């Protein structure tokens, strides 16, 4: 009885640990060839590739752990593998983030958005959690809560496509101070752009394709999400992701 209880609790503990990682990675796996296709010469260096590879490894480990035939020794081995993988990933990501500290990312403001930006955004590689790029903006005319909620920070790749269009409440970053109802021309705004999927603890993306997009990060654009330009980027990204899901399903089905 004690042995059965131990086995049950041991399995539950390992599942919980992997589950925490899979909350970030999400379901599904990408092939090794997909990971090898991810470029490492962009603004974010090898972090997107390392993230995608980590996701693959965690998903593979999960599949092994959920095998119908899993002995007590295999449970312990799987947990040890996961612990080692997690620590190795932390070290790799920490080194990669530190190497990016201070690196500049261009930022633009869409015509019609009442703001200007001073210089570029700079990566803060010394923070825990999300990797951020920080900069300073300025109102060019009065701001209200009504139009503030329309403005989003969109990461754009080298081909002019959106990498993501919605995250964290609709923003891929924050415009601190823009929410003030009495925003005045000349008032300073702190701009914080989030780089998704490359945290110290590893991946927050479930697909190598997501990391392929981040690997091609070229700039951020502050946009009005009610404009046709934003809506076009959003629809294009949705179509691209839908096609990727169909391609993955065909691959699993052997087509």
Language model features by range: what are they?
Residues 2-12:
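Bacterial N-terminal signal peptides that target proteins for export
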Residues 20-24:
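C-terminal motif of bacterial Sec signal peptides marking the signal peptidase cleavage site
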Residues 26-28:
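Bacterial signal peptide processing site
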Residues 47-60:
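Short amphipathic alpha-helical heptad-repeat segments
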Residues 62-78:
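Charged, low-complexity interaction regions
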Residues 81-125, 229-248:
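Transition segment at domain starts
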Residues 111-149:
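Short, surface-exposed binding/anchoring microloops in extracellular/periplasmic proteins
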Residues 159-217, 224-228:
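Short, solvent-exposed, Trp/other aromatic-anchored flexible loops in extracytoplasmic proteins
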């Amino acid at each position: 009885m004690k042995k059965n209880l131990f086995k049950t609790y041991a399995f539950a503990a390992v599942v919980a640990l992997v589950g925490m990682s899979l909350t970030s990675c999400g379901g599904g796996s990408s092939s090794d060839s997909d990971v090898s296709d991810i470029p490492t010469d962009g603004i974010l260096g090898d972090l997107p590739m390392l993230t995608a590879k980590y996701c693959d490894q965690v998903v593979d480990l999960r599949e092994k752990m959920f095998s119908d035939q899993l002995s007590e020794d295999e449970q312990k081995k799987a947990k040890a593998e996961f612990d080692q993988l997690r620590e190795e990933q932390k070290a790799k990501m920490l080194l990669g983030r530190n190497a990016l500290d201070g690196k500049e990312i261009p930022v633009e403001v869409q015509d019609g958005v009442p703001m200007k930006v001073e210089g570029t955004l700079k990566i803060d590689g010394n923070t825990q959690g999300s990797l951020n790029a920080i900069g300073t903006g300025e109102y060019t005319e009065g701001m209200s809560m009504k139009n503030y909620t329309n403005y989003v920070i969109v990461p754009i790749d080298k081909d002019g496509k959106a990498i993501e269009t919605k995250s964290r409440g609709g923003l891929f970053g924050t415009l601190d101070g823009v929410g003030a109802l009495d925003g005045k021309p000349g008032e300073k705004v702190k701009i914080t752009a989030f780089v998704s999927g490359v945290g110290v603890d590893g991946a927050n993306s479930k697909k190598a394709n997501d990391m392929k997009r981040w690997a091609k990060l070229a700039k951020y654009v502050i946009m009005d999400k009610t404009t046709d330009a934003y809506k076009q980027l959003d629809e294009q990204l949705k179509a691209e992701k839908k096609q990727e899901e169909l391609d993955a399903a065909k691959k699993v089905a052997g087509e």
